[in-house]
Amino acid sequence: MNQPFDKLLDARGLNCPMPLVNARKEIARLEPFQVLKVVATDRGSVADFQGWAKVAKNVELVGQDTEPMGGVSVYVHYVKRVA
């Protein structure tokens, strides 16, 4: 997936719930309609980001993907701040 983004958050090596905790902090620093790209190695982050996007009123999950990076699969999440 080649989604444009405004800021990158590297959450590789962090376990649940830290990728989501750090993403929430970063998304608060973005302007509305900017996109945060999060890369994580925690498989559970896929469901975590989906759940967050369903309940949060200020974010939209615009894409998710799995990419190889350094011999490891990383989970990539694109989150847009909408408010």
Named regions from a protein language model:
Residues P4-R12:
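Short amphipathic
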Residues P17-V59, D65:
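Amphipathic, hydrophobic secondary-structure cores in small proteins
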Residues E60-A83:
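C-terminal edge-of-domain segments
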Residues M1, A28, E67-M69:
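Short secondary-structure boundary/capping segments
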